[in-house]
C-alpha cells in the first residue's frame, strides 16, 4: 500500500486503541490489512505470551482463510509473529501440521469455524490467552449457518479479548450478533456491499431447461474468457461443466468434492488464463480475489 484506504484509515486507529469494532466494508477495500496490520503491530511488541495463541481470525471458507494467511505471511516477513491456517478438506498430514502449529502457540490462527471447533473438541487448541478475536465476512458465516459455532468459540475466549467484526452487509442478524459479542463497539461503514459500477448486469427470466441455450447464445456472440458460472449445488456444477466440455469449451469445475490441492490447481489455471470458464458452487464466491 502506498497510502491507506478509507476503511484502513478509519479502523486501524480504533483497533490500536483496544476498542471493539464492527466495520461494514466489501471485498476489495483493503479490509484484511485494516485488521491484520494493527493486530500484527500489537503482537510484535512482545507483550503477549510467546508460546500461546494470541489472535483468532475466523473466515467462512478455506479459500478466504488461505488468502488471509498469505497476506499475513507477507506482512510478517521481517516481524517475529507466526501464523497458521486451519481449515477442512485436507489430508491427515495437513491436520497434523495444523495441530502442531496451534499446540506450539502460533501467534495468529486463521480458521474456518467447523475445523477450529474440531480441534477444540479434541483438546488440541488453548484459547485462554487470546487477545484478539476477528470475524471476517461475518454475514457470510451467518448465511452458512455458523452462528452456533461462532458463539461456542466466543464463550471460550477471555473476557478481556478485543473483538473485531467485518461484514459486507449489515442485516438485522449481524446487528444481533454484534450486540451479543461486542462491548461498546465503534461502528465504521465503508462502501456497503454493492455491485461494481463497471459491471453490466442482465437478468434472464427462464426455466431450468432454457439456461444452457442462453449460455450457448452468449458464448456464440463473444468467445468466453475468464468466465465464472456459479451454481447452487455441486451436482449442478458437475453436470454443467461436463455439458460445456462436450460442447468443446475450455472449462473446469470447482466444488467441495475436490481435494484442496486440486482446487488450488484449478484456481491457478483459471487465473493464468489456461481455463476460460470456471463453474463453481456459490460457497466459493467469497474468497476469490
Language-model regions, residue ranges each:
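Conserved helicase RecA-like core
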Residues: 1-289
Amino acid at each position: 500500500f502506498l497510502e491507506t484506504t478509507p476503511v484502513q484509515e478509519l479502523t486501524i486507529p480504533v483497533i490500536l486503541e483496544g476498542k471493539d469494532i464492527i466495520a461494514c466494508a466489501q471485498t476489495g477495500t483493503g479490509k484484511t490489512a485494516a485488521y491484520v496490520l494493527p493486530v500484527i503491530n500489537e503482537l510484535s511488541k512482545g507483550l503477549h505470551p510467546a508460546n500461546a495463541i494470541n489472535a483468532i481470525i475466523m473466515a467462512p471458507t478455506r479459500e478466504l482463510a488461505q488468502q488471509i494467511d498469505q497476506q499475513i505471511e507477507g506482512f510478517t516477513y521481517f516481524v517475529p509473529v507466526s501464523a497458521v491456517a486451519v481449515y477442512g478438506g485436507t489430508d491427515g498430514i495437513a491436520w497434523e501440521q495444523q495441530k502442531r502449529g496451534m499446540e506450539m502457540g502460533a501467534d495468529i490462527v486463521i480458521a474456518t469455524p467447523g475445523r477450529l471447533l474440531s480441534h477444540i473438541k479434541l483438546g488440541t487448541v488453548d484459547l485462554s490467552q487470546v487477545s484478539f478475536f476477528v470475524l471476517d465476512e461475518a454475514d457470510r458465516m451467518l448465511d452458512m449457518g455458523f452462528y452456533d459455532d461462532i458463539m461456542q468459540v466466543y464463550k471460550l475466549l477471555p473476557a478481556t479479548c478485543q473483538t473485531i467484526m467485518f461484514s459486507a452487509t449489515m442485516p438485522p442478524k449481524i446487528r444481533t450478533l454484534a450486540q451479543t459479542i461486542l462491548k461498546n463497539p465503534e461502528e465504521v461503514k465503508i462502501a456497503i456491499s454493492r455491485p461494481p459500477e463497471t459491471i453490466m448486469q442482465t437478468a434472464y427470466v427462464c426455466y431450468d431447461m432454457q439456461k444452457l441455450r442462453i449460455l450457448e447464445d452468449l458464448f456464440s456472440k463473444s468467445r468466453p474468457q475468464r468466465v465464472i458460472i456459479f451454481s447452487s449445488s455441486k451436482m449442478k456444477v458437475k453436470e454443467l461443466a461436463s455439458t460445456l466440455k462436450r460442447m468443446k469449451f475450455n472449462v473446469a469445475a470447482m466444488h467441495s468434492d475436490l481435494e484442496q490441492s486440486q482446487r488450488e490447481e484449478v484456481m491457478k489455471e483459471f487465473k493464468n488464463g489456461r481455463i476460460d470458464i470456471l463453474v463453481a458452487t456459490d460457497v466459493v464466491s467469497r474468497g476469490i480475489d
